[in-house]
Amino acid sequence: MLEIKDLCKRYVDKQALDHVSLTVGPGEIVGLFGENGAGKTTLKKCILSLIRYDSGSVTLDGAAFTRANIGRFSFATCEHSFFPALSAQAHREFYEEHFETFLSRRFEGLMEFFGLPMDKPIRSFSTGQKNQFEVIMALSQGADYILMDEPFAGNDVFNREDFYKVLLGILEPHETVILSTHLIEEVTGFIGRAVLLHEGKIVGDAQTAALDEQGLTLMEYVKQTFSYQSDRVSKALAELTGREDDDA
């Protein structure tokens, strides 16, 4: 069980996280949503101890993070955490040496699924391929908690859609995913829980099954929570063109 209690993080001129509390259990697939600067990436980096938070706590099964349990987490980020001069095969050998839980069969299957070469340096990959490889490594580490930050930036809609189908098929019951993306509609059928962040605060937390029972789509829930103004496009067009747009 991952428990985040009263977490605060401030940068010089901005409160990035403002008393965030969140509990995520084994096997959950959680979507973390919010506008740019809402605190999504900061929260994940605080969970992983990549940056220091000012106050609050992050525990795993009631214990503080140490070198002994940090390996239960993996992180796929579009900032890229791999060794660009090394090949995929070299990465595999490195991970097999350092992570007893490394899932070689999953690694091979995902590399084949995405059609990525094993023998070329990662720096020769396109941006989309680099993001694919980042996700492959995160999923193959054998971690219990897999954090993803805009995992498929630079990939086409077909790759993204197929990946989510594959991911649902390969995840084990104990594997937990915390995923942030702006492509809300694409992950609607994938996630089981939606957590909404706004200005460093959690402003919404709902099970997607409960939203279905209420007759709400995930996008409708997000718009409702953030008080989305449905007429903002028509107002902008009227201001920009000097005429009303009845179809906006």
Describe the predicted segments one by one:
Residues I146-E150:
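Catalytic Walker B motif of ABC-type/P-loop ATPase nucleotide-binding domains
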Residues C78-F133:
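ABC-family P-loop ATPase nucleotide-binding domains
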